[in-house]
């Protein structure tokens, strides 16, 4: 598959295009601390087979993109959003269907607000609306208190995952097993966890990045001001909010809360899906995304 290295303000971003460039472009924006490889090849190929030219890329500080000392070179969500636009520019894409998960869910909302002319549609999942203070909700969950937002806080599985990432691991094999365990916790209890499937993916991701060490820098990025949530009402891009019904990070009804703030936004629920992309959810997830993109182009 063709790849492109993109230089933007001294930051280099790795990107890849999958499918027929003549098809409708679809940009995948990954979650925090995750590279383009977090979008499984099998899932990407489904989207391409459905008539999309799929573009995925490594966030800065992941995969083959630039890595810096965050203390010396801090950045925020605005920079991550402009990275996504730089990727579209590099592939000479005027406007694209955009799909964002987790951290990409937040970036997608910012793009719909600040660069609506670059979006044909937006699909978001595995995250909350801009008016939800996730950091405060996470703190409440750690204390066993209700959320500030009134929405469900991250579950025990998500808290266990956060604790796992703080544990030391020495050898590559130990790092690999920790990565697999992270996904077991995020996968939730709805879909049986296939450790071999995720071990294979993590080997590919580590090979892509050249290291088994996982970045953690995106946990240091302050979330956008919750005041931006009031702006969601002016979004005109067709929006689909996908609710993973077993998501330990953003449990129901986070997607409904988001959709209720955007005119015309729709919600699709994926039963048994957690905060991960196992093979078992690829078919319904791709079907929901492709139905949304097709509806906007009819």
UniProtKB/Swiss-Prot annotation:
Boundaries of each AB hydrolase-1 domain copy? 25-277
Q: In which pathway does it act?
A: Antibiotic biosynthesis; daunorubicin biosynthesis; Antibiotic biosynthesis; carminomycin biosynthesis
Q: Does the keyword Hydrolase apply?
A: yes
Known EC number: 3.1.1.-
Which superkingdom?
Bacteria
Against InterPro entries, the record matches this protein to: AB_hydrolase (IPR050471), AB_hydrolase_1 (IPR000073), AB_hydrolase_fold (IPR029058)
Q: Which UniProt keywords apply?
A: Antibiotic biosynthesis, Hydrolase
Tagged with keyword Ribonucleoprotein: no
- Output one GO BP term: antibiotic biosynthetic process
Gene Ontology MF annotations:
intramolecular lyase activity; triacylglycerol lipase activity
Reactions catalysed according to its record: rhodomycin D + H2O = 10-carboxy-13-deoxycarminomycin + methanol + H(+); 4-O-methylrhodomycin D + H2O = 10-carboxy-13-deoxydaunorubicin + methanol + H(+)
Q: What does this protein do?
A: Involved in the biosynthesis of the anthracyclines carminomycin and daunorubicin (daunomycin) which are aromatic polyketide antibiotics that exhibit high cytotoxicity and are widely applied in the chemotherapy of a variety of cancers. Catalyzes the removal of methyl group from the carbomethoxy group of rhodomycin D (10-carbomethoxy-13-deoxycarminomycin) and 4-O-methylrhodomycin D to yield 10-carboxy-13-deoxycarminomycin and 10-carboxy-13-deoxydaunorubicin, respectively.
**Family membership noted in the UniProt record:** Belongs to the methyl esterase DnrP family.
- List the protein's name: Rhodomycin D methylesterase DauP
Gene name in the database record:
dauP
């Amino acid at each position: 598959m063709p790849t492109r290295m993109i230089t933007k303000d001294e930051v280099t971003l790795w990107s890849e295009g999958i499918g027929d460039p003549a098809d409708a472009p679809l940009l995948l924006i990954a979650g925090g601390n995750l590279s383009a490889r977090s979008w499984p090849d099998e899932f990407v190929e489904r989207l391409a087979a459905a008539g999309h030219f799929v573009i995925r890329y490594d966030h800065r500080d992941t995969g083959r993109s630039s890595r810096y000392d965050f203390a010396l070179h801090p950045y925020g969500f605005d920079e991550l959003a402009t990275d996504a636009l730089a990727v579209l520019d590099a592939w000479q894409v005027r406007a694209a269907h955009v799909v964002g998960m987790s951290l990409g869910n937040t970036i997608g909302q910012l793009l719909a607000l600040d660069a609506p002319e670059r979006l044909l549609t937006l699909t978001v999942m595995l995250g909350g609306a801009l008016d939800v203070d996730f950091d405060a909700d996470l703190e409440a969950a750690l204390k066993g208190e209700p959320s500030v937002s009134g929405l469900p806080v991250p579950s025990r599985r998500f808290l266990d995952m956060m604790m796992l990432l703080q544990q030391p691991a020495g050898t590559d094999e130990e790092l690999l097993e920790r990565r697999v365990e992270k996904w077991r916790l995020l996968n939730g209890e709805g879909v049986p966890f296939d450790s071999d499937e995720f071990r294979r993916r993590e080997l590919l991701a580590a090979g892509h990045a050249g290291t088994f060490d996982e970045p953690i820098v995106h946990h240091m990025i302050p979330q956008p001001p919750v005041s931006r949530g009031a702006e969601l009402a002016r979004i005109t891009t067709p929006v689909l909010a996908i609710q993973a019904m077993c998501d330990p990070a953003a449990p129901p009804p986070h997607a409904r809360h988001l959709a209720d703030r955007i005119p015309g936004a729709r919600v699709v629920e994926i039963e048994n899906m957690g905060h991960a992309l196992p093979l078992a959810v690829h078919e319904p997830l791709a079907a929901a995304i492709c139905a949304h993109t097709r509806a906007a182009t009819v």
